[in-house]
From Swiss-Prot:
Organism in which the protein naturally occurs: Bacillus subtilis (strain 168)
Membrane topology label: Multi-pass membrane protein
Transmembrane region(s): 11-31, 41-61, 65-85, 100-120, 121-141, 154-174, 180-200, 220-240, 272-292, 308-328, 331-351, 367-387, 396-416
Keyword Transmembrane helix: yes
Family, similarity comment: Belongs to the nucleobase:cation symporter-2 (NCS2) (TC 2.A.40) family.
Database matches in NCBIfam families: ncs2 (TIGR00801), NCS2_1 (NF037981), pbuX (TIGR03173)
InterPro entries reported in the protein's UniProt record: NCS2, UacT-like, Xan_ur_permease
Annotated GO biological process: xanthine transport
Name by which UniProt lists this protein: Xanthine permease
GO cellular component: plasma membrane
Any single Pfam family the record assigns to this protein: Xan_ur_permease
């Protein structure tokens, strides 16, 4: 019994390590971009880790209302980074969490029938959106590589050397290691980079010593939420894109566990994700989605028991209650994070391209959908003021590359694929009716 629990515990720790880098990078990026204090940033990382555990347990615990019951780990989605920063800059932190709460409620409501809407989000749409997400995140990575936007030593050679050292370590680990070490290469790169940065005088431990030993979570840490239409629409789009990504993860895990997923299973999975997003907004954390890197770990270890993921969720919740653990993440220099971000966000772009590789580019319509959506998404990212003369209600939607590109991809897919398919079916039905009449 003891040996069995020890094995389950070790596997749970492996899953924590596999997703930990992704879990801490998002709050660090968003928190620094919104100008949070060290104390607030420590809380943001702590609550994010805690809520990752809660979200994971909600999904693993399958009941009649929610939970898909697969060995899936949930973490904060990279899709939300740019929109959260944009909303925070325009409306303030309270509106960020108001829009997350609203998007969580929306996901819960549409979970009953979202499985029927997946046809509106084929690979040509999701691949374009994921590619745009990666592209729009790259400026954040590059700014951090140089030392962080607005820093006194921005672009200093020491920052660039540190960032490229971290990136090189990650690349080498991917090339020359296998299995679990390969799956945590980004975390190892960050740890080694921070160790090197300490000897360069770029790491200060004051944040760790000042942090509380234990801190209970509290709702609305940053104040009462505010609600505005444009941010709600933006975060709702983010939530829907995350659902589409999660659907792929669910089916991948279904194949690994030899389980055929039904529409009811998917609905419960979506509902658990919506509940996680809602709680993330209430406790001032993040929107959550299924982490694909943990799917790779399930495949690697061959262990498909939900008990392992339950242990993972409990460990994450425990970590979130100790701010000193979160404070350690705040000492990571921006240049170290920047080097890791290039690999992480570059992988997002590569994953989007991989999704696009599954579509039929012999159809000119698909080429045009990708061209227009990625083109507009990138264009708005590079020239965010292009639509500033529009009414204020539309400004946030049109000055965010992810939203602009996503909207373009969805609309063009409906025009070229959904309507044309419906028209073709109607024509075939008319033809069949004519033949019957003859």
């Amino acid at each position: 019994m003891r040996n069995g629990f020890g094995k389950t515990l070790s596997l749970g720790i492996q899953h924590v390590l596999a997703m930990y880098a992704g879990a801490i990078v998002v709050p660090l990026i968003v928190g620094k971009a919104m100008g949070l204090t060290v104390e607030q940033l420590t809380y943001l990382v702590s609550i994010d880790i805690f809520m990752c555990g809660v979200a994971t347990l909600l999904q693993v615990w399958s009941n009649r209302f929610f939970g898909i019951g697969l060995p899936v780990v949930l973490g904060c989605t990279f899709t939300a980074v740019s929109p959260m920063i944009a909303i925070g800059s325009e409306y303030g932190v309270s509106t960020v969490y108001g829009s997350i709460i609203a998007s969580g409620i929306l996901v819960i409501l549409i979970s009953f029938f979202f499985g029927k809407l997946v046809s509106f989000f084929p690979p040509v749409v999701t691949g374009s959106v994921v590619t745009i997400i990666g592209i729009t995140l790259m400026p954040v990575a590059m700014n951090n590589m140089a030392g962080g936007e607005g820093s006194a030593d921005f672009g200093d050679l020491s920052n660039l050397a540190l960032a490229f050292t971290v990136l090189s370590i990650i690349v080498l680990l991917y090339r020359f290691t296998k299995g679990f070490i390969k799956s945590v290469s980004i975390l190892i790169g960050i740890l080694i980079g921070t160790f090197i940065a300490y000897f360069m005088g770029k790491v200060q431990f004051d944040n760790v010593s000042d942090a509380a030993v234990v801190q209970m979570i509290q709702p609305f840490y940053f104040g009462a939420p505010s609600f505005h239409a444009a941010p709600i629409i933006t975060m709702s789009i983010v939530a829907i894109v995350s659902l589409v990504e999660s659907t792929g993860v669910y089916f991948a895990l279904g194949d690994l566990t030899n389980r055929r997923l039904t529409e009811i299973d998917l609905s419960k999975g979506y509902r658990a994700e919506g509940l996680a997003v809602l709680l993330g907004g209430i406790f001032n954390a993040f929107p959550y989605t299924a982490f694909s890197q943990n799917v790779g770990l399930v495949q690697l270890t061959g262990i498909k028991k939900n008990a392992v993921i339950v242990v993972t969720g409990v460990i994450l919740m425990a970590f979130g209650l100790f701010p000193k653990i979160a404070a350690f993440t705040t000492i990571i220099p921006s240049a170290v994070l920047g080097g890791a971000m290039v690999a992480m966000f570059g992988m997002v772009i590569a994953y989007g391209i991989k999704m696009l590789s599954r579509i039929d580019f012999a159809k000119q319509e698909n080429l045009l959908i990708v061209a227009c959506s990625v083109g507009l998404g990138l264009g708005v990212t590079v020239v965010p003021d292009i639509f500033k003369q529009l009414p204020s209600a539309l400004t946030l939607l049109t000055t965010n590359g992810i939203v602009a590109g996503s909207f373009t991809a969805v609309v063009l897919n409906i025009v070229y694929n959904v309507f044309s398919k419906a028209k073709k079916i109607e024509q075939e039905a008319d033809l069949a009716e004519q033949k019957t009449a003859v």
